[in-house]
A protein has these predicted regions:
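Polyanion/phosphate-binding surface patch
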Residues: 1-15, 57
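Short terminal or interdomain "cap/linker" segment that borders an active site or interface and mediates
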Residues: 103-139
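Positively charged, Gly/Ser-enriched RNA/tRNA-binding surfaces
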Residues: 11, 19-34, 40-93, 139-341
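Short, conserved phosphate-binding/catalytic loop or strand-edge motifs used
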Residues: 60-64, 100-108
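A conserved hydrophobic position in a structured secondary element of the catalytic/binding core
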Residues: 16, 101, 253
Length: 341
């Protein structure tokens, strides 16, 4: 329901890419099928979804993401989560939090309660929206014991620090749930080694919209936004659908929401300036082009300007339009400003 669809001239249904995980899995199972594991892939590309509740906010977005395939350990989960933390830090987001959940804990909890598949889907949807009132009314209509209903109502409230895991263990006897909790404890321990455990909290009622997630899932929240700007998790069953069974995890960062968060932080975005601006005396164009190529080969960004005098170049450096200037006068290179080459 959240995929944009259209038709081709033969009336076949076409879908706009809703996320980047499935294309990455298809790549790993096709062109990269003989590549050694684990695979570490990254991408920056557009995706589009139909958001019925936030249609006016965004539909198409550019995502930057990573996928780690072929490694199913807690270390792999922690590596990807730590990378998500570093991505938000590198982007300049100052006040953020990564919330961790566990799909297997939720599914085990609902199975233990004896709910049908349809009932589980309804409860998951209400948990995703933190809609406690509707969830309580829905459970009241079901023929389940009061104690089961009480424990189910605790599920969306199981969020906070690691102490939440202790409470969760007291609410269930399901081996599936207990294994999921133990796995989360491992991930949290490894995140301590990465030095980013203070950026992480637990939300055992956390769910994802995509139905292919199978283990640890997470969201990245910024104080300036009312919705996640980053999401990801483990999707071990998905690669097998494309002919290459293997564990996998990853995340995607919304660049549109990241820019929105930065703007609300008060960040301003100045246009980039070149390292060097370069101009030349009459008849010196060929030499100037050759010199610009030499600098660019060394990793120096160069803007070639036409018809400026040496004095005008100096003024532009002084005004902050470049770090340095070079004026080519015959065979003489007149340099001004910071030495970056």
């Amino acid at each position: 329901e959240q995929v944009w669809k259209t038709f081709d001239p033969q009336a076949r249904i076409l879908a706009v890419r809703p996320d980047s995980t499935i294309p990455a899995v298809r790549l790993a199972s096709g062109r990269l099928k003989n590549a050694p594991l684990p695979l570490r892939l990254c991408y920056v590309q557009s995706a589009a979804k139909f958001h019925s509740e936030t249609l006016s906010l965004l539909c198409e977005d550019t995502q930057a993401g990573v996928e780690l395939m072929g490694e199913g350990s807690a270390q792999a989960d922690a590596e990807v989560i730590a990378l998500a933390v570093e991505a938000l830090r590198a982007a300049g987001i100052r006040d953020f939090l990564i919330e961790l959940g566990q799909v297997k804990f939720v599914s085990g909890f609902l199975e233990e309660a004896g709910l049908t598949a349809q009932q589980c889907a309804a409860v998951r949807d209400m948990m995703a929206h933190k809609n406690a009132l509707d969830m309580q009314l829905y459970l009241d209509r079901l023929s389940i014991e009061a104690d089961v209903s009480r424990r189910l109502m605790r599920l969306p409230q199981l969020f906070g620090d690691a102490a939440v895991l202790d409470e969760a263990e007291q609410l269930t006897q399901s081996p599936k749930c207990l294994r999921a909790i133990a796995h989360l404890r491992q991930v949290l321990s490894i995140l301590q080694d990465y030095g980013c455990a203070d950026c992480v909290s637990i939300d055992l009622g956390l769910t994802q919209q995509a139905n292919y997630y199978s283990g640890v899932v997470f969201h990245g929240l910024a104080a300036e936004l009312g919705q996640p700007l980053l999401s990801g998790g483990r999707y071990d069953g998905l690669p097998a659908q494309f002919g290459r069974p293997m564990p996998a995890t990853g995340f995607a960062l919304s660049l549109k929401l990241t820019l929105m968060a930065l703007e609300r932080q008060g960040e301003t975005f100045a246009p980039p300036v070149p390292d060097v601006i370069l101009s030349f005396a009459p008849g010196g164009l060929r030499s100037a082009i050759a010199y610009a190529h030499q600098l660019r080969d060394k990793g120096v960004s160069v803007a070639l300007l036409y018809g400026l005098t040496a004095e005008e170049l100096h003024q532009r450096v002084d005004s902050g339009e470049a770090s340095a200037a070079v004026y080519l006068n015959g065979s003489v290179f007149e340099q001004y400003g910071k030495a970056v080459f």
